[in-house]
Amino acid sequence: MIKRTICLVYPLFCLASPTWAEESPWTYRIGMTNVAFDASAKVYLNGQRVPGGSADASDNNALTFDFGYAINDQWNVRAIVGIPPTTKVTGAGTLPGIQLGKITYAPTVLTLNYNLPALGPVRPHIGAGVNYTRIFESRDANLKSFDADHAWSPALHVGADIDVNRGWFVSIDIRKLYLKTDASGYLGPQEAKARVTLDPLLTSIAIGRQF
């Protein structure tokens, strides 16, 4: 009776309770994510395809936050967001060394995951879902009036949580995004457009807590 009263008056005490931690469907993770692009592009100048022209994007690291909700023992929903990093977009193929511009972006990935059988303290999972990448800023380099579009894409997810002690765990996750976007600008007097394939691989390591 006393414990119940304390929980009603001080909800934070309930969060610290082992019984509550075991029953809560909510998880939270904070960690670092590496974004490794597998980039290519179809480049057009004044509407004409540039033979062999392509593009590349620099890899990034970002602080990320991951929120999870357990639907039941087998299924959960996860969403990851982060501090927006900036990638440098450069020419490739027959356009080597051309600094096209910089893009500050933020992918938000939502996946439905299935929990595989646990291996001791290791709890693996697989899943799939959707990503929305928002472009916060496009900065000029050799391309003037450089601009890139927001984009949606499918996402795949595989990972594992490794229990440390009651309620705390280490989380390792890999997410693959099949992401394309359109970019445009001016290279001198010529109008430049590109259909850019980014297809990043997001590799995360984080500390997690069940609340």
Curated annotation (Swiss-Prot):
The keyword Iron-sulfur does not apply. InterPro entries: OMP/PagP_b-brl (IPR011250), OMPW (IPR005618). Pathway: Aromatic compound metabolism; naphthalene degradation. GO terms for cellular component: outer membrane. It holds the Pfam family OmpW. Encoded on an unnamed 75 kb plasmid. May be involved in the conversion of 2-hydroxy-4-(2'-oxo-3,5-cyclohexadienyl)-buta-2,4-dienoate to cis-O-hydroxybenzylidenepyruvate. DoxH and doxJ encode different enzymes that may have interchangeable functions. This is Dibenzothiophene metabolism operon protein DoxH. It comes from Pseudomonas sp. (strain C18). The lineage of its organism: Bacteria, Pseudomonadati, Pseudomonadota. The gene is doxH.
